[in-house]
Protein backbone atom coordinates (compact mmCIF):
# COMPACT_ATOMS: atom_id res chain seq x y z
CA UNK A 1 0.00 0.00 0.00
CA UNK A 2 1.44 3.34 -1.06
CA UNK A 3 1.65 6.26 1.33
CA UNK A 4 0.41 9.48 -0.27
CA UNK A 5 1.60 12.50 1.74
CA UNK A 6 -0.66 15.49 1.24
CA UNK A 7 0.60 19.01 0.57
CA UNK A 8 -2.20 21.60 0.62
CA UNK A 9 -1.33 24.96 -0.97
CA UNK A 10 -3.30 28.15 -0.33
CA UNK A 11 -2.06 31.64 -1.24
CA UNK A 12 1.34 30.15 -2.00
CA UNK A 13 1.70 28.67 1.48
CA UNK A 14 1.41 25.20 2.97
CA UNK A 15 -1.71 24.82 5.08
CA UNK A 16 -3.52 22.29 7.21
CA UNK A 17 -7.29 21.85 7.15
CA UNK A 18 -8.31 20.42 10.56
CA UNK A 19 -11.89 19.78 9.41
CA UNK A 20 -10.99 18.85 5.84
CA UNK A 21 -12.63 21.92 4.31
CA UNK A 22 -11.02 25.25 3.45
CA UNK A 23 -14.25 27.04 4.39
CA UNK A 24 -14.18 25.79 7.98
CA UNK A 25 -10.68 26.34 9.34
CA UNK A 26 -7.23 26.91 7.84
CA UNK A 27 -3.91 26.70 9.68
CA UNK A 28 -0.90 28.18 7.87
CA UNK A 29 2.25 26.15 8.46
CA UNK A 30 5.77 27.45 9.00
CA UNK A 31 7.29 25.30 6.26
CA UNK A 32 6.68 26.42 2.70
CA UNK A 33 5.14 23.89 0.27
CA UNK A 34 8.50 22.78 -1.15
CA UNK A 35 9.95 22.30 2.33
CA UNK A 36 6.88 20.35 3.37
CA UNK A 37 7.14 18.11 0.31
CA UNK A 38 10.83 17.48 0.97
CA UNK A 39 10.02 16.73 4.60
CA UNK A 40 7.46 14.07 3.69
CA UNK A 41 9.77 12.41 1.16
CA UNK A 42 12.72 12.42 3.57
CA UNK A 43 10.55 10.62 6.12
CA UNK A 44 9.63 7.87 3.66
CA UNK A 45 6.62 8.97 1.59
CA UNK A 46 6.66 7.19 -1.76
CA UNK A 47 3.88 9.35 -3.27
CA UNK A 48 2.90 13.01 -2.94
CA UNK A 49 -0.60 14.42 -3.33
CA UNK A 50 -0.59 18.17 -3.98
CA UNK A 51 -3.92 19.96 -3.63
CA UNK A 52 -4.17 23.48 -5.09
CA UNK A 53 -6.81 25.09 -2.88
CA UNK A 54 -6.74 28.44 -4.70
CA UNK A 55 -7.55 26.72 -7.98
CA UNK A 56 -10.22 24.59 -6.36
CA UNK A 57 -11.97 27.44 -4.57
CA UNK A 58 -11.48 30.38 -6.92
CA UNK A 59 -10.14 29.10 -10.25
CA UNK A 60 -6.90 30.94 -9.40
CA UNK A 61 -3.84 29.15 -10.81
CA UNK A 62 -1.13 31.28 -9.22
CA UNK A 63 0.35 28.21 -7.51
CA UNK A 64 1.15 26.33 -10.73
CA UNK A 65 4.83 27.46 -10.92
CA UNK A 66 5.34 26.39 -7.30
CA UNK A 67 3.72 23.01 -8.02
CA UNK A 68 6.03 22.51 -11.00
CA UNK A 69 9.00 23.39 -8.78
CA UNK A 70 7.98 20.77 -6.23
CA UNK A 71 7.59 18.13 -8.93
CA UNK A 72 11.04 18.95 -10.31
CA UNK A 73 12.70 18.71 -6.91
CA UNK A 74 11.37 15.46 -5.46
CA UNK A 75 12.15 11.94 -6.59
CA UNK A 76 8.73 10.36 -6.01
CA UNK A 77 5.62 10.38 -8.22
CA UNK A 78 3.41 13.42 -7.64
CA UNK A 79 -0.37 13.42 -8.07
CA UNK A 80 -1.91 16.90 -8.41
CA UNK A 81 -5.51 18.00 -7.92
CA UNK A 82 -7.63 21.00 -7.13
CA UNK A 83 -9.58 23.03 -9.66
CA UNK A 84 -8.65 20.94 -12.68
CA UNK A 85 -11.52 21.64 -15.06
CA UNK A 86 -10.22 21.68 -18.62
CA UNK A 87 -7.97 19.74 -21.02
CA UNK A 88 -5.57 22.70 -21.06
CA UNK A 89 -5.10 22.50 -17.28
CA UNK A 90 -4.49 18.76 -17.45
CA UNK A 91 -2.01 19.24 -20.30
CA UNK A 92 -0.15 21.92 -18.33
CA UNK A 93 0.16 19.76 -15.21
CA UNK A 94 1.33 16.69 -17.07
CA UNK A 95 3.76 18.77 -19.14
CA UNK A 96 5.04 20.13 -15.83
CA UNK A 97 5.87 16.61 -14.68
CA UNK A 98 2.79 15.49 -12.76
CA UNK A 99 2.58 11.71 -12.55
CA UNK A 100 -1.21 11.78 -12.28
CA UNK A 101 -3.88 14.47 -12.26
CA UNK A 102 -6.93 14.26 -10.01
CA UNK A 103 -10.33 15.44 -11.22
CA UNK A 104 -13.42 15.67 -9.02
CA UNK A 105 -16.40 17.83 -9.91
CA UNK A 106 -15.59 17.92 -13.62
CA UNK A 107 -15.49 14.13 -13.77
CA UNK A 108 -18.98 14.09 -12.29
CA UNK A 109 -20.70 16.88 -14.21
CA UNK A 110 -19.11 16.43 -17.65
CA UNK A 111 -18.32 12.79 -18.22
CA UNK A 112 -17.89 13.30 -21.97
CA UNK A 113 -15.08 15.76 -21.27
CA UNK A 114 -13.62 13.40 -18.66
CA UNK A 115 -13.74 10.56 -21.19
CA UNK A 116 -11.86 12.70 -23.74
CA UNK A 117 -9.21 13.69 -21.19
CA UNK A 118 -8.67 10.07 -20.11
CA UNK A 119 -8.36 9.07 -23.76
CA UNK A 120 -5.72 11.74 -24.37
CA UNK A 121 -3.79 10.85 -21.19
CA UNK A 122 -4.22 7.10 -20.60
CA UNK A 123 -3.21 5.97 -17.14
CA UNK A 124 -2.70 9.53 -15.90
CA UNK A 125 -6.12 10.65 -14.62
CA UNK A 126 -7.55 9.81 -11.19
CA UNK A 127 -11.14 10.45 -10.14
CA UNK A 128 -11.66 12.02 -6.72
CA UNK A 129 -15.01 11.01 -5.21
CA UNK A 130 -16.40 12.78 -2.13
CA UNK A 131 -18.95 10.40 -0.64
CA UNK A 132 -21.91 11.50 1.51
CA UNK A 133 -23.32 9.18 4.22
CA UNK A 134 -26.00 7.82 1.86
CA UNK A 135 -23.38 7.14 -0.86
CA UNK A 136 -24.48 10.12 -2.94
CA UNK A 137 -21.45 11.96 -4.28
CA UNK A 138 -20.85 15.59 -3.37
CA UNK A 139 -19.48 18.14 -5.85
CA UNK A 140 -18.18 21.72 -5.86
CA UNK A 141 -16.24 21.45 -2.63
CA UNK A 142 -18.88 19.46 -0.74
CA UNK A 143 -21.46 22.24 -1.28
CA UNK A 144 -23.84 20.29 -3.55
CA UNK A 145 -25.13 16.78 -4.02
CA UNK A 146 -24.58 15.44 -7.51
CA UNK A 147 -27.62 13.17 -7.72
CA UNK A 148 -25.23 10.33 -8.60
CA UNK A 149 -24.21 7.50 -6.31
CA UNK A 150 -20.98 5.69 -5.63
CA UNK A 151 -21.43 2.34 -7.37
CA UNK A 152 -22.89 3.69 -10.63
CA UNK A 153 -20.26 6.43 -10.79
CA UNK A 154 -17.41 3.98 -10.24
CA UNK A 155 -18.66 1.92 -13.19
CA UNK A 156 -19.14 4.96 -15.44
CA UNK A 157 -15.77 6.58 -14.70
CA UNK A 158 -13.96 3.25 -14.96
CA UNK A 159 -15.44 2.85 -18.43
CA UNK A 160 -14.32 6.39 -19.22
CA UNK A 161 -10.72 5.46 -18.47
CA UNK A 162 -9.99 6.61 -14.92
CA UNK A 163 -6.66 5.19 -13.75
CA UNK A 164 -7.49 5.35 -10.04
CA UNK A 165 -10.23 6.32 -7.60
CA UNK A 166 -9.59 8.41 -4.51
CA UNK A 167 -12.44 8.10 -1.99
CA UNK A 168 -13.03 10.64 0.75
CA UNK A 169 -15.94 10.73 3.17
CA UNK A 170 -17.61 14.11 3.59
CA UNK A 171 -17.37 15.30 7.20
CA UNK A 172 -15.87 12.07 8.51
CA UNK A 173 -12.67 13.64 9.84
CA UNK A 174 -14.58 16.38 11.63
CA UNK A 175 -16.67 13.72 13.40
CA UNK A 176 -13.57 11.66 14.28
CA UNK A 177 -15.01 8.63 12.53
CA UNK A 178 -12.92 5.83 10.96
CA UNK A 179 -12.57 5.24 7.22
CA UNK A 180 -15.73 3.91 5.60
CA UNK A 181 -14.63 0.34 4.97
CA UNK A 182 -17.97 -0.58 3.37
CA UNK A 183 -17.44 2.00 0.63
CA UNK A 184 -13.86 0.86 0.10
CA UNK A 185 -15.02 -2.76 -0.20
CA UNK A 186 -17.65 -1.68 -2.71
CA UNK A 187 -15.02 0.11 -4.78
CA UNK A 188 -12.65 -2.86 -4.68
CA UNK A 189 -15.38 -5.20 -5.94
CA UNK A 190 -16.73 -2.78 -8.56
CA UNK A 191 -13.63 -1.57 -10.41
CA UNK A 192 -10.22 -2.99 -11.24
CA UNK A 193 -8.35 0.30 -10.96
CA UNK A 194 -6.40 1.41 -7.90
CA UNK A 195 -8.51 2.51 -4.93
CA UNK A 196 -7.03 5.17 -2.63
CA UNK A 197 -8.42 5.97 0.82
CA UNK A 198 -8.37 9.66 1.73
CA UNK A 199 -9.37 10.81 5.20
CA UNK A 200 -10.78 9.21 8.31
CA UNK A 201 -7.50 7.81 9.62
CA UNK A 202 -7.73 8.45 13.36
CA UNK A 203 -4.63 6.51 14.35
CA UNK A 204 -2.39 3.57 13.59
CA UNK A 205 -5.19 1.08 14.18
CA UNK A 206 -7.17 2.56 11.28
CA UNK A 207 -4.06 2.56 9.11
CA UNK A 208 -3.46 -1.08 9.99
CA UNK A 209 -7.06 -1.95 9.08
CA UNK A 210 -6.69 -0.24 5.72
CA UNK A 211 -3.47 -2.11 5.07
CA UNK A 212 -5.10 -5.45 5.85
CA UNK A 213 -8.40 -4.85 4.03
CA UNK A 214 -8.76 -7.44 1.26
CA UNK A 215 -11.69 -8.30 -1.00
CA UNK A 216 -11.38 -11.13 -3.51
CA UNK A 217 -7.62 -10.78 -3.51
CA UNK A 218 -7.71 -7.01 -4.01
CA UNK A 219 -6.43 -4.45 -1.53
CA UNK A 220 -6.46 -0.70 -1.07
CA UNK A 221 -3.65 0.65 -3.22
CA UNK A 222 -2.86 3.76 -1.22
CA UNK A 223 -3.80 5.94 1.72
CA UNK A 224 -3.55 9.73 1.95
CA UNK A 225 -2.09 11.15 5.16
CA UNK A 226 -1.09 14.62 6.26
CA UNK A 227 -3.10 16.39 8.92
CA UNK A 228 -3.28 13.17 10.96
CA UNK A 229 0.49 13.45 11.44
CA UNK A 230 0.70 17.20 11.99
CA UNK A 231 -2.12 16.79 14.52
CA UNK A 232 0.04 14.29 16.42
CA UNK A 233 -2.05 11.15 15.90
CA UNK A 234 1.05 9.21 14.83
CA UNK A 235 4.45 9.85 13.27
CA UNK A 236 5.35 9.42 9.65
CA UNK A 237 7.98 6.86 10.60
CA UNK A 238 5.28 4.76 12.22
CA UNK A 239 3.06 5.08 9.16
CA UNK A 240 5.84 4.10 6.77
CA UNK A 241 6.77 1.04 8.77
CA UNK A 242 3.15 -0.01 9.12
CA UNK A 243 2.20 0.16 5.45
CA UNK A 244 5.35 -1.38 4.02
CA UNK A 245 4.89 -5.10 3.51
CA UNK A 246 8.37 -6.05 2.37
CA UNK A 247 9.39 -7.11 5.87
CA UNK A 248 7.19 -10.17 5.45
CA UNK A 249 6.90 -13.06 7.91
CA UNK A 250 8.10 -13.65 10.53
CA UNK A 251 8.89 -9.95 11.09
CA UNK A 252 5.73 -8.38 9.68
CA UNK A 253 3.37 -6.95 8.69
CA UNK A 254 3.42 -5.19 12.04
CA UNK A 255 0.43 -4.52 14.23
CA UNK A 256 -0.09 -0.97 15.47
CA UNK A 257 0.77 -2.00 19.04
CA UNK A 258 3.95 -3.80 17.97
CA UNK A 259 4.99 -0.83 15.88
CA UNK A 260 4.48 1.66 18.70
CA UNK A 261 6.55 -0.51 21.01
CA UNK A 262 9.29 -0.84 18.40
CA UNK A 263 9.40 2.90 17.76
CA UNK A 264 9.62 3.63 21.48
CA UNK A 265 12.51 1.19 21.80
CA UNK A 266 14.27 2.69 18.79
CA UNK A 267 13.86 6.28 20.00
CA UNK A 268 15.19 5.35 23.42
CA UNK A 269 18.32 3.81 21.92
CA UNK A 270 18.75 6.35 19.09
CA UNK A 271 17.70 9.69 20.63
CA UNK A 272 19.44 11.81 18.00
CA UNK A 273 18.10 9.98 14.95
CA UNK A 274 14.96 11.06 13.07
CA UNK A 275 15.78 9.24 9.86
CA UNK A 276 12.99 7.01 8.59
CA UNK A 277 15.28 4.70 6.60
CA UNK A 278 17.51 4.13 9.63
CA UNK A 279 14.46 3.24 11.73
CA UNK A 280 13.19 0.86 9.04
CA UNK A 281 16.59 -0.81 8.71
CA UNK A 282 16.74 -1.23 12.47
CA UNK A 283 13.18 -2.57 12.53
CA UNK A 284 13.88 -5.09 9.80
CA UNK A 285 16.84 -6.44 11.69
CA UNK A 286 15.36 -6.21 15.17
Feature locations, PLM:
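Glycine/small-residue-rich loop that forms an oxyanion/phosphate-binding "nest" at active or ligand-binding sites
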Residues: 54, 62-119
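Catalytic cores of alpha/beta
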Residues: 74, 78-97, 182-218, 239
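Glycine-rich, proline-tolerant flexible connector loops at the mouths of alpha/beta enzymes
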Residues: 47-65, 105, 167-176
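Short, acidic/polar
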Residues: 29-40, 86-91, 146-156
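Conserved anion-binding
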Residues: 12-24, 98-173
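Structural preference for beta-strand elements that scaffold enzyme active sites
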Residues: 2-6, 47, 75-79, 100-102, ...
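Alpha-helix-loop-beta-strand connector modules within alpha/beta enzyme cores
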Residues: 59-79, 114-130, 178-197, 202-203
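Glycine-rich phosphate-binding active-site loops on the catalytic face of alpha/beta enzymes
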Residues: 92, 96-113, 169-171, 198-203, ...
